[in-house]
Amino acid sequence: VQGNLTNNATLTTQAPSKVKFSGAANSNFKSNGATISNLEISKNNSTVTLTDAASVSGVLEFGSGTSSKMLLGANNLVLGTGASASGHDADEYVVTNSTGVVQKNYTDNTYTNQSFTFPVGDASIYSPLTSSLSGTASGANIKVKVTNADQPNRATTLPEATSYLTRYWSVDATGITSYSNVLTGQYNTSDDIVGTAARVKGSS
């Protein structure tokens, strides 16, 4: 697909089929509730914007060296229980530029250090968040978005308050008991740090 894609009927995709966006023009994608088996974003220095929520059951793939991004706006991108993401890097990723989130669903199971990297960033900087989940999942999901701003609830009275990131990740976990999670976010040291990097502390 090199232009816009709007599903006005019943769209059925099965592995190993995929919906692939390519070309140099920006595209809009409206799935109207259909679940896509595999979705590839291989635009040439351009974007794919969701105009409603989208669901992927297989692989969300970004083409290497294409400088292509998916813009969520107010819409969620849902990755199913068996879904994965590949090819994301500093030039190819999901932009959480409004209220939309990347949601990863989990099979009902007990997990120990189950790793998944959310391929998110803002309009200009790739800021993935890796989740290492432990706990028992039942109808579970984790939602993630990144915001290029000072965290609004950041402590300002502690001695370390003069050193902080001007970027934060919002994480919402649902349906997980005995929940623990090691979260590792990537940020840009030249753009995102105020003060001294060694004094920056994370919080939840």
Each language-model region and where it sits:
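Extracellular beta-sheet-rich ligand-binding/adhesion modules
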Residues: 1-203
